[in-house]
Amino acid sequence: RKELYRMMQIESITIKTKQMIDDLKAICANFGLGGSPGEYKIITQVFLYKYLSDKFGYEASKVEPSIAEAENVEAALTAMPDEDYEMMLMMLGGNVAKLKKNHYISYLFNHQNDDSMKKADGTPYPFHELFDDTLVDIANYNLDIFSVQTGSEEKIKLFEPISQYVIETAKKSAFCRAIINKLVEFSFAEVFEQKYDFFSQIFEYLIKDYNKDFGKYAEYYTPHTIADIIARIMVHGEVTNATVY
């Protein structure tokens, strides 16, 4: 009976995850990005942001008992005193991306219509800029752990701004709102408890439309940064004599 329940959990989260991917692709299509080179970069980066955010919450709840008992993990983390929060970050393992409180998906969701937000110079802070700045700041904050070095030892960051692919400035914030509203609908937390390799089939589903028809979407490949993260997720333990392309 326990095994049946576990499989039902996996089935449910698989359906939700594939629906999220389809919804993200639909959003791209609605904003004129369907089938464009930018669509693939948006989908993979947004999915990775979702994964790393949920993984962070899951790992934080393992090292901080009070968080594990909370109904809303991100809300409980946000309420933590800053000193306790910094201590918790130090206790997380090296394979977990570290997040600041304003990096959370819930933070972006709660501020998507906040007209009171201002930049340092006092000018309005459009939501698409907040979204982009959050992704870039996560990448910079985790540069030493989650980045890939080129042959010239230049570090390729985890994320880049995604609203740049929306041509019309007036539509950029609406695009980012549509994205963030899809990311709050469920959590991967249940999957992290399973030994089943859930994400292998999800990654196949994620890229299936970009790896067929020999050029229908121009020429696609998995960015080195994304491929490296995928490899770390799918392969556990030390690996030698292996190259990620």
Regions found by a protein language model. Give the residues of each.
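Non-catalytic, mostly N-terminal accessory regions of nucleic-acid modification and defense proteins
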Residues: R1-V239
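Conserved class I S-adenosyl-L-methionine
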Residues: V239-Y245
